[in-house]
Amino acid sequence: MDKKEYSETFYHPYKPYDIQVQLMETVYRVLSEGKKIAILESPTGTGKTLSLICATMTWLRMNKADIFTRMETNIKTNEDDSENLSDDEPDWVIDTYRKSVLQEKVDLLNDYEKHLNEINTTSCKQLKTMCDLDKEHGRYKSVDPLRKKRKGARHLDVSLEEQDFIPRPYESDSENNDTSKSTRGGRISDKDYKLSELNSQIITLLDKIDGKVSRDPNNGDRFDVTNQNPVKIYYASRTYSQLGQFTSQLRLPSFPSSFRDKVPDEKVKYLPLASKKQLCINPKVMKWKTLEAINDACADLRHSKEGCIFYQNTNEWRHCPDTLALRDMIFSEIQDIEDLVPLGKSLGICPYYASREALPIAEVVTLPYQYLLSESTRSSLQINLENSIVIIDEAHNLIETINSIYSSQISLEDLKNCHKGIVTYFNKFKSRLNPGNRVNLLKLNSLLMTLIQFIVKNFKKIGQEIDPNDMFTGSNIDTLNIHKLLRYIKVSKIAYKIDTYNQALKEEESSKNENPIKETHKKSVSSQPLLFKVSQFLYCLTNLTSEGQFFFEKNYSIKYMLLEPSKPFESILNQAKCVVLAGGTMEPMSEFLSNLLPEVPSEDITTLSCNHVIPKENLQTYITNQPELEFTFEKRMSPSLVNNHLFQFFVDLSKAVPKKGGIVAFFPSYQYLAHVIQCWKQNDRFATLNNVRKIFYEAKDGDDILSGYSDSVAEGRGSLLLAIVGGKLSEGINFQDDLCRAVVMVGLPFPNIFSGELIVKRKHLAAKIMKSGGTEEEASRATKEFMENICMKAVNQSVGRAIRHANDYANIYLLDVRYNRPNFRKKLSRWVQDSINSEHTTHQVISSTRKFFSMRSLNSR
């Protein structure tokens, strides 16, 4: 199949919509032309994920096919070097040798695909038997060094004993030594081993099948060298549930082999990367409740004398039959994250480390944002983006995510609680701690007291910038001490021991008092432990850059915030072949260009904003021109606006929309919604509206109302959901079909300009404009647009909840006269802009609404 046919079909499993073809062609063209960035907006419900898969996998397989063809051509034209043959050999001998080498590598590729097919037809219970058979065929030569050890390890004591809370002896001045050896019984750390193990870059597929990589005679895997894919597709998203949706979509299409008839059946080598919290199978580690504690407990166990029964940091473990069997089982079919845990348990092999070992073979890798966006995490996991395709989905949150990864915040209350926790821990275990641990805990406590005193003495207003050197003025704390304390926290794993000990005390006290910990407290248990927050904050203190700023935030907090997200993103851009930023609501795209890609030439950036797959008659967007409906900061509390105009609009709309269809309205803040509800309740308007439609409203600390609203809609009683922009219901929840036949945006949801974060960001942006030669007017314009972009991104994200598939229908109501202004209107998503109705007065809007739903009712008969 030639390139034209590839680009026309993309092996989509269904007949694609026009916008899906448009998106696939754009992605394929970007990759073929070597463009660096693609920013793609495709509304939710338009098959965006499947289109991205089809386009990128088609290009990937075509690219590998081109490499294979060039390799065959090089053999025919004698362009390769047959270093194992003498220059005096006849040409026909050299040619025959080259062909035989190529054929040998192709045979190995074919053998591996057949091997994966064998696994795919074998149940998990038969897997060990199959491994033994494979050994007879010479695929696995090593003896499983762990089997005997695992047999006697079925019953593990996972209860928390006092010994679990005590760190290993720590030498206070050992920072100049190899800490992995001095504190871990001579074992080498994973990071040190990994960095030396896979340091060479893989450029083309020919490098992998040319036979030049020396083979370890103790390596029992005959496929280890031949199946490493130099160009990969890395797909990152915000949550594991979103990554799971990608997995289900990847199962739908089928792609041809890169090697044509030479290797007729080439499976998609898919690898889902996840954290130890998702993949760990050791009960001694999983008894801890937070990700940070699990990571530290894992490291503690692996480097202990006892070790982990499911993993060893040795070549022997990497090439033992069960480890290789788990790796191959991962690639035998498209496995989800949840599939890896039972597979690992059935073989007694750690799925987390086995999946890391499988990375070189993978074609497609899914990973959470943190794994991709944090350079240190990529390094520790040996994620090499060189010449690969990086897809970042749900990218409307990308800038905020980068900022949060490289930022840190600690409050006065956090510091006091951490101080109290250390004192409690120290008083309990001081007689059982060696001098190194005691000294460092006292130093850490002294540092906390210094920070507490600094906040109490210096906090004056939110947004007040802080010189980090001022935090320790007049104290005996200096940067060197902080570096040593950070080393201590990292090596000793003291953070999870202190935090979990104090949590155990709370649970024990609660049990004695027969007063179970409230649900809200249980939720906090899984949040980040305090001492980890402290260590992150200290890390920011010791790694100062000009791109960040310390300042005071609300609740007597000190925050470090990254101000230039483009800096850490540069490393991804520099390594990857192409970065695709995709999402359902990517407007305004100017935000990405100015904040994330300022140094990328415009000719290297491709943008696409797709329309929706629904027929045009299935969506209407209304913007009122009534001056009374203006929710500015000065006017929004007006009794006339709230009790008359806003209330009457909801009453009229509730009557115009059929009762079987729900209405979802988004308010700019919890405070404003609470004000509206209070006003309506004071004069019985709330009861009046509630008689027309059952009202459900979101409260900041309230219970989940979605299930009640959904049940009410299902019963056809007429329901109205009042939600918050940026709240629990504005993102990630699909209000499809009758759950939302009308979505209302009340006002323009500008962020709080008095928050410390926005004060510092706006000041930084204005200073940057002035520094580059701009005027005060230009700086003012830039900060104004910055605020507008935040606002309109939130609008697009909220109204995008309404339409979820091709047959869905709904109306959008933008309830503020300011939406008529070009600067706001042009920042709406394209599919929303294209659906704007010319009706402007509320009377006209309601009349048009009745006609809209009347037509839907007639068409459904």
UniProtKB/Swiss-Prot annotation:
Q: Where is this region: Disordered?
A: 161-188
Q: Which residues carry this modification: Phosphoserine?
A: 86, 172
Q: Which cofactor does it need?
A: [4Fe-4S] cluster
Q: Which GO terms describe its molecular function?
A: ATP binding; ATP hydrolysis activity; DNA binding; DNA helicase activity; iron-sulfur cluster binding; metal ion binding
Question: What are the record keywords, sorted?
Answer: ATP-binding, Cell cycle, DNA-binding, Helicase, Hydrolase, Iron, Iron-sulfur, Isomerase, Metal-binding, Nucleotide-binding, Nucleus, Phosphoprotein
GO cellular component terms, alphabetically, are: chromatin; nucleus
Its Enzyme Commission number(s) read 5.6.2.3
Query: What SUPFAM superfamilies does the record point to?
Result: P-loop containing nucleoside triphosphate hydrolases
Lineage top rank: taxon: Eukaryota
- Catalytic activity, reaction form: Couples ATP hydrolysis with the unwinding of duplex DNA at the replication fork by translocating in the 5'-3' direction. This creates two antiparallel DNA single strands (ssDNA). The leading ssDNA polymer is the template for DNA polymerase III holoenzyme which synthesizes a continuous strand; ATP + H2O = ADP + phosphate + H(+)
Q: Which amino acid positions bind [4Fe-4S] cluster, per UniProt?
A: 280, 298, 308, 350
The compartments listed are: Nucleus
What quaternary arrangement does the UniProt entry report? Interacts with ECO1.
Remarks, miscellaneous: Present with 98 molecules/cell in log phase SD medium.
The protein's name is ATP-dependent DNA helicase CHL1
This chain's source organism reads: Saccharomyces cerevisiae (strain ATCC 204508 / S288c)
